[in-house]
Amino acid sequence: MRPKDLCCLVLMAGTLLAQPAKLENMQGKTIMLFTPHPDDDTFCCGGTLALLAKNQNRIHIVIYTNDDKGSYDPEMTSERLARIRKAEEEEACRILGIPKENILWLQYHDGMLEYANPRDLVEQTTGLIRKYRPDVVLSIDPGSENVRWHKTDHRMAAMNTIDAIRAAEWHLYFPNQRLHDGLEPWKVPAEFFYYVTQKDANYFVNIDSVVETKLSAALAHVSQFPPAVERYRPDWDPARLEKMKAALRGRAPKRDGHYIEAFRAATGFSEQ
């Protein structure tokens, strides 16, 4: 048998043996979600996170940046916006059922993630994977055709997370984590990627039962919606809130008449 034929058989076996369990039905598992900004997690995965929280899963949200640049308000400062975005993310997670203690802030500046030291960034996130040993990782799809056109933090978060997932399982990557911190290698059993293209989506979570929860969590990010994005105010006018919620509900993705969140499910090396 030629080596390349053997390789194909191994890849096929990996695909057949490593099919992920239904994400939304998992119970008592450890879930890690990596997001470039506070709000990408809510907008893309809020319904799924609410279902996972209801099922008593341990959910850890890793946020690469503090999102301290996204305001048109001329009186806003980066320091103030970072504090606002932190409070908004904590409120969104509370609505979804995730305690604020489970939010891990890496504290990079908005738009600057791509200019961080790549080795240090991979080492940092590899250490988190080894520490929390997730059964599932959710992250931006690194294989998406349009990932290169995403804003800088999205590109870097997608690629860095998948690099960390791969490094985490091999003990010779960042061996100091094992020697000094007692962090053993960890192979992530299942990965689900969000911000997925329509043609690449192969996994859909029905969020009918939690769509209102997701919308409420999304609207906790007050500073990212008008009018607050132009002139910051900390709360919603009630009439505008209901109007915006209706608009978000109307744009929410549906499949066969059901509200859904779309992912690309991948397992190990065979489908990344």
Region spans (language model):
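Metal-dependent de-N-acetylase/amidase catalytic core
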Residues: 2, 8, 18-34, 111, ...
